[in-house]
Amino acid sequence: MFSTPQEKRRHLRVDYKIPVKISSDHGDILTETKNLSCSGAYCRVAQRLDPMTKLKVQLLLPLRKAEKLVTKKIICQAVVVRAQAVDGEVYYDTAIFFSDIASKDSRTINEFVEAMMEKKNYGKFN
């Protein structure tokens, strides 16, 4: 399912800010996602990460379980796909591909994305 006719991604992606910790050989970066899918994330980071840099990613995904809001920590391996300087700023918009993620975690992210898309489409924000 694609968002627009020009969209070529295989998985739904939602614009949503989720806390994320990105770890590489150069240290840890705390940031948040700009958008998310079960196959990757797009983040703004304060340092350039070269394409193909291997990362450990920790996402803090807000989930609703039995009418309670809980946080699910998802840890996976990832690879930088693209890093683009933001004009006039010292940040880089960085695309990350989840290269090694547990199937259940990928499903959890996908269910989250679908739920957020449904809320977005129907205007039901809780």
Task: Locate predicted features.
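C-terminal output/interaction extensions
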Residues: 87-126
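A residue-level detector for short acidic-glycine micro-motifs
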Residues: 35, 47, 80-82, 100
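Short coil-to-beta-strand transition motifs
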Residues: 15, 68-77
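N-terminal helix initiation/capping motif
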Residues: 1-36, 44-46, 114-126
